[in-house]
Amino acid sequence: MRIAVLGYVGSGKTYVSNYISERKSIPCLHLDSVKYDNEWKPIDNSVILPQVEEFMEKRSWIIEGSCRELLIDERLEKADKIVILLLPRTICLLRVLKRKKEREQEGYKSDLNWWFLKFAMFGCRNKIRRRFYAEITNKYEEKTLVLKTKKHVNDFIQSIVD
């Protein structure tokens, strides 16, 4: 099974991906982990793209992240299931704040600043991004699932792991 997980900042992409990966023994690639170093400085795409291409050759995978410049068309074509997490702003904001605290306790430099908060609450939900998700849903209707509530997310992951 190949699953592409996309969605808003703080929507639970990493949680969903890890939960399924651990229970179904499916390798998982978090695009943020290859796109940025430990201080959240971007790594050049020429270094990243071969890693993503190689990962997509696996028989089963979960790729988590909405980075369009990292082979989005190829990921969506190869995916058996596309999951788009569009949870409410308040839920996402609380998760972003919780993640900041957890990362700081793990010794990572915080990626949370005014610009990032503004992006998480408004930028990743702008008209262009909403159109992007709508286009994916229309183009890949038969294999796309849009989840907008925590209950829908939990129901989905249970349906996969059961």
Question: Where do the model's predicted regions map?
Answer:
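Walker A (P-loop) ATP-phosphate-binding motif of ABC ATPase nucleotide-binding domains
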Residues: 2
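Hydrophobic anchor at the beta1->P-loop junction of P-loop NTPases
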Residues: 5
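Walker A/P-loop
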Residues: 14
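NTP-dependent small-molecule kinase module
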Residues: 23, 124-162
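Conserved nucleotide-sensing/catalytic segment adjacent to the nucleotide-binding pocket
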Residues: 27-81
